[in-house]
């Protein structure tokens, strides 16, 4: 029951002692009363405590070596990229912690958002997810191809922020220290070096819209998503401390790098560098190449950390299948163990799975579907076959030439 009187008897707040005449509203409970002022004060106390918890978390940011150790437990290969990400993430949250306690005359530290470049299935999304999980911060993923600039049919860039707020259970202060990964960023690059005279709905316009939230602004986000409407309540969120990681395959950027490096070889200058055909051009990418690919200079400037990921080799994919803490082979072994069955993969079978993933150009993300294809019938039949004690996956089974080998009691 809420009100200022209870059966016309004068009531007082049980917490501050003020009467109903001294406050705007008194809420009655079971033999207890609370005024609107104490409710507001309680909300402030809770908000401050939650904020202190967030700040306390930031003071315990793992050091780069510790972050790298975590990544090594889950991510195979990509050593240079993992090292670059570990340093960038550590510096970002060190900056956030420093900014909270800085004096006005201290050095103003700029954000160091991250651009990840690498082929499909090389681990870009998984790296970002693993970092967010290890830091215990809210994490959201967005697809750049679904975004359009304001006024066009599609998703506003502010909806990316809503996903982060939702991941933080609508705790805005916690969301303001989260991580957002924007995938397929290369798909909104301008095609070619000539600027189109027509309006670029999903290209440069989206880059400009993303630029505002990436560099740091107070954005108004519709609580239910969708387009903004007049008189609609908005959630205000400051993006200055949100770490943005953007990624894409950037198919063809190696040719841009080769062309740039090749131009230096053609001349007669003594500082010309010799290009090794076997060298990794991905590690040679600079801002000039990314701009030539089609991202605007202002956008590139807000992504000072560039982490290049390599195409995964057969040996890398085999390690991914077996080594990480959550390796797929371990997962399927655990699944069958619940039925009392041992699962074994022949070495040749693992090589066949990795080869298939490379042929399909799906990288690590295609490994699970290949195992599912191979084991579908087995996982269907095993629960009903109580005499089976072991399943062995062979190369022939992966290639569809025979069924997995079953051993019975």
Swiss-Prot record:
InterPro entries: AAA+_ATPase, ATP-dep_Clp_protease_ClpX, ATPase_AAA_core, Clp_ATPase_C, Clp_protease_ATP-bd_su_ClpX, ClpX_bact, P-loop_NTPase, Znf_CppX_C4. Coiled coil: none annotated. It comes from Streptococcus pyogenes serotype M12 (strain MGAS2096). Belongs to the ClpX chaperone family. The keyword Coiled coil does not apply. Keywords: ATP-binding, Chaperone, Metal-binding, Nucleotide-binding, Zinc. NCBIfam families: clpX (TIGR00382), PRK05342.1 (NF003745). ATP-dependent specificity component of the Clp protease. It directs the protease to specific substrates. Can perform chaperone functions in the absence of ClpP. GO terms for molecular function: ATP binding; ATP hydrolysis activity; ATP-dependent protein folding chaperone; protein dimerization activity; unfolded protein binding; zinc ion binding. This is ATP-dependent Clp protease ATP-binding subunit ClpX. GO terms for cellular component: HslUV protease complex. HAMAP family: ClpX (MF_00175). ATP binds at residues 119-126. SUPFAM superfamilies: Glucocorticoid receptor-like (DNA-binding domain), P-loop containing nucleoside triphosphate hydrolases. The keyword Cell membrane does not apply. It comes from the Bacteria. Residues 1-54 form the ClpX-type ZB domain. GO terms for biological process: cell division; proteolysis involved in protein catabolic process. PROSITE patterns: CLPX_ZB. Component of the ClpX-ClpP complex. Forms a hexameric ring that, in the presence of ATP, binds to fourteen ClpP subunits assembled into a disk-like structure with a central cavity, resembling the structure of eukaryotic proteasomes. Zn(2+) binds at residues 13, 16, 35, 38.
């Amino acid at each position: 029951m809420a009100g200022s009187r209870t059966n016309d008897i004068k009531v007082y707040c049980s917490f501050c002692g003020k009467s109903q005449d001294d406050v705007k509203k008194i809420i009655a409970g079971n033999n207890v009363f609370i005024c609107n002022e104490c409710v507001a004060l309680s909300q402030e106390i809770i908000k401050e405590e939650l904020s202190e918890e967030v700040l306390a978390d930031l003071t315990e940011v793992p050091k780069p070596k510790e972050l790298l150790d975590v990544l090594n437990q889950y991510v195979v290969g990509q050593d240079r990229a993992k090292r670059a990400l570990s340093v960038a993430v550590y510096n970002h949250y060190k900056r956030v912690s420093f900014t909270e306690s800085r004096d006005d005359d201290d050095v103003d530290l700029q954000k160091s958002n991250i651009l990840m470049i690498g082929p499909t299935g090389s681990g870009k999304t998984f790296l970002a997810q693993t970092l967010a999980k290890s830091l215990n911060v809210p994490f959201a993923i967005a697809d750049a191809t679904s975004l359009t600039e304001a006024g066009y049919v599609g998703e506003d860039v502010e909806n990316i922020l809503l996903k982060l707020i939702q991941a933080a259970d609508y705790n805005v202060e916690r969301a303001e220290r989260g991580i957002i990964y924007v995938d397929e960023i290369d798909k909104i690059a301008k095609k070619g070096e000539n600027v189109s005279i027509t309006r670029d709905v999903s290209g440069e316009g989206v880059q400009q819209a993303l630029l505002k939230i990436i560099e740091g602004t107070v954005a108004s986000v519709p609580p239910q998503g969708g387009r903004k409407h007049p008189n609609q309540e908005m959630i205000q969120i400051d993006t200055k401390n949100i770490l943005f990681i953007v990624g894409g395959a950037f198919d063809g950027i190696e040719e841009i790098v080769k062309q740039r490096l090749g131009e230096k070889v053609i001349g007669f200058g003594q500082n010309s560098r010799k290009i090794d055909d076997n060298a990794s051009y991905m590690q040679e990418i600079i801002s000039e190449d990314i701009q030539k690919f089609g991202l605007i200079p202002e956008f590139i400037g807000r992504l000072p950390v560039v982490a290049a990921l390599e195409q995964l080799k057969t040996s890398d994919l085999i390690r991914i299948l077996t080594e990480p803490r959550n390796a797929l082979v371990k997962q399927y072994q655990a699944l069958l163990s619940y039925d009392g069955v041992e699962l074994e993969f022949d070495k040749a079978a693992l090589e066949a799975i990795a080869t298939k993933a490379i042929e399909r150009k799906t990288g690590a993300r295609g490994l699970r579907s290949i195992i599912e294809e191979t084991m579908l019938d087995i996982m269907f039949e095993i629960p009903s076959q109580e005499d089976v004690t072991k399943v062995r996956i062979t190369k022939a089974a992966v290639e569809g030439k025979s069924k997995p080998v079953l051993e019975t009691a």
